[in-house]
Amino acid sequence: MRRRRENTPLRDLRTYGSTRAVRLPDCDYSGDIDIHLTLRADRMAPFKHRDLAQMICKNVEFYCRRLRYTLYGYCLMPDHLHVLLSPAGSGTALSRWLDSFKSYTTHESMKLGRRPPFWQRSGNDHICRAAETAEKVLAYLVENPVRAGLAERWEGWPWTKVLMEI
């Protein structure tokens, strides 16, 4: 175990319980980048309901078209959503896509009888680096239902859509 320096107060070393930045501080997420998003539902497995799953998938595609994002693919699992997209050429920051999508789908979920909050407050995003192509990330993303035992092949999972070759 590492020893702390004698002159450093313990309270200055504490990180648990504090809010951490989930986005890179100097990145506006609106350039020529590919982003893998993972958004978690606030409650257990709401997407097992067909009406809700259809609404979520429809709106992933809608908000990508509306904000001129390139959508490579997505996979909706019972309790979370994976999306691979790129804001390249849209001039719109990722925060706007997230705010619009999460706000609208929360509103629509209330019409379907769900109580807010619908999404967890933050999500995970991962910028695809040079060593990992969007194709590799998409291949990983679509295999989620297979790894979880929900489908034998990714093509058999109704809430997966691929819009690029893998």
Question: At which residue positions do the language-model features occur?
Answer:
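Short catalytic/metal-binding and nucleic-acid-binding patches
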Residues: 1-166
